[in-house]
């Protein structure tokens, strides 16, 4: 690594050094309490998968260049130079962490390893060593926001074709069961690309008599996955600007954990509220705006709490409220939602597909064991494993196949739509 590259990377590092970040970097006592809290370490007990080790990869560079002792005494506190070897270590640290923050729940000092790992991801971007796939997906999202008028006709053609599928689930008096560009709508729904994220949601909104409109943009924020703050902001602002232009009162995010957390926590103070679709479904049930076949699902049902929606987003009671309405045999797994095991698919790992599949399956053994231990399901039970996150759904499907669990992995929103009654 040449000096100009190193200097550029250290400038990026320095830009992340808020007071909170400095506390995280300087507080660790090496107590090790966080170590067994990580799903990767619990599944594969190797030191390099401990949260403290991941943080230490970043911390040693911090000591070398941002602490007087490290500059004067190069060997102090295992201070380490930022070089090509360090970049490889940063890459492993960054992309074996899903950002689930389970370790933070156990840390006596509340050190946020995910925030420390965000430095690693930013340095990788600066060095051109980040996963190319994630950067490409983030760039495509940014480009879509800059050329929305060009994609509108094709998007609307696709939406009109989906409307017949919505009507198969719930009859609508509206000319368009999937409304778009409705200024003054109460709700802007931000979906993912694909019928599975649009059709069930539209059926439930129409059943509730909602005044809603569909966003032109998909919810997922690939800028957040790759750890690029500028692209994260650009992708987020597409939706914020659309919501402001349409003067909606609420932005509802589909079953996508990172999309929900980014919109909820990073959009700043806005004239609209932000909700997950799970919160909206629970609200409809409490207000009597929709009716479901109560206890109509007789198969055993287990629920996986997505980390970004539950532990990092606070949505824990609503999915259980819905499931206890839907299911005759709902089985709670332990530990409780704040301490639930991560599925192992977050942080961009699922988006990397086959590239990360082997690691994802090995690191998710603790999740598979948790499901078996508390679900108490036999393959012949045809039990349902429900979740409210696209990444989790994909990862849990992979886990189900890899560990031969014999489960039927479903989206919670689809279960609600399937159970609608007049």
How should these model regions be labeled?
Residues 191, 278, 305-307:
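Short, structured patches in soluble enzyme cores that scaffold and shape functional sites
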Residues 5-8, 27-30, 39-93, 312-320, ...:
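Hydrophobic scaffolds flanking metal-cofactor catalytic centers in soluble metalloenzymes
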Residues 28-34, 38, 97-103, 107, ...:
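Short cysteine clusters
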Residues 36-64, 105-124, 348-364, 394-405:
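Iron-sulfur (Fe-S) cluster-binding segments and ferredoxin-like electron-carrier domains
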Residues 15-25, 55, 59-262:
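Iron-sulfur-cluster electron-transfer modules
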Residues 284-327:
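C-terminal amphipathic alpha-helical segment
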Residues 14-32, 83-102, 245, 330-340, ...:
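Immediate flanking context of iron-sulfur cluster ligation sites
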Residues 110, 191-273, 310-323, 331-422:
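Cofactor-cradling patches in redox/metallo enzymes
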């Amino acid at each position: 690594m040449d000096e100009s590259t190193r200097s550029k990377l250290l400038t990026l590092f320095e830009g992340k050094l808020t007071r909170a970040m400095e506390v995280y970097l300087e507080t660790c006592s090496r107590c090790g309490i966080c170590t067994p809290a990580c799903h990767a370490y619990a599944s594969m007990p190797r030191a390099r998968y401990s949260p403290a080790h991941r943080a230490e990869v970043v911390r040693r560079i911090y000591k070398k260049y941002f602490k007087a002792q490290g500059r004067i005494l190069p060997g102090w506190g295992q201070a380490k130079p930022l070089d090509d070897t360090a970049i490889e270590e940063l890459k492993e640290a960054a992309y074996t962490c899903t950002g689930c923050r389970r370790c933070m729940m156990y840390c006596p000092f509340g050190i946020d390893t995910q925030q420390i790992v965000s430095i690693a991801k930013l340095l990788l971007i600066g060095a051109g060593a980040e996963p190319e796939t994630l950067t490409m997906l983030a760039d495509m999202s940014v480009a879509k926001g800059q050329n929305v008028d060009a994609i509108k006709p094709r998007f609307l053609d696709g939406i009109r074709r989906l409307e017949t599928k919505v009507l198969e689930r719930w009859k609508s008096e509206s000319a368009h069961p999937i409304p778009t560009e409705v200024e003054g709508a109460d709700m802007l729904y931000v979906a993912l690309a694909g019928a599975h994220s649009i059709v069930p949601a539209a059926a439930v909104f129409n059943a509730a008599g909602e005044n809603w409109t569909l966003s032109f943009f998909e919810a997922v924020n690939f800028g957040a996955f790759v750890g690029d703050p500028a692209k994260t902001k650009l992708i987020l602002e597409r939706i914020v600007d659309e919501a402001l232009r349409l003067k909606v009162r609420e932005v509802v995010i589909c079953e996508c954990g990172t999309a929900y957390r980014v919109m909820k926590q990073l959009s700043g103070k806005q004239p609209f509220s932000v909700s997950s679709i799970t919160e909206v479904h629970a609200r409809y049930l409490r207000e009597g705006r929709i009716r479901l076949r109560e206890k109509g699902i007789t198969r055993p049902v287990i629920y996986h709490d997505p980390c970004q929606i539950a532990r990092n987003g606070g949505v824990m009671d609503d999915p259980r409220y819905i499931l206890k309405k839907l299911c005759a045999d709902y089985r709670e797994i332990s530990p409780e939602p704040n301490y639930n095991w991560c599925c192992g698919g977050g942080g961009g790992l699922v988006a990397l597909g086959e590239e990360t599949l082997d690691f994802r399956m090995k690191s998710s053994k603790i999740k598979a064991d948790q499901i078996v231990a508390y679900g108490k399901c036999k393959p012949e039970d045809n039990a349902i494993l429900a979740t409210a996150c696209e990444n989790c759904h994909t990862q849990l499907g992979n886990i189900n196949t890899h560990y031969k669990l014999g489960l039927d992995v479903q989206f919670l929103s689809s279960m609600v739509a399937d159970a609608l009654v007049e």
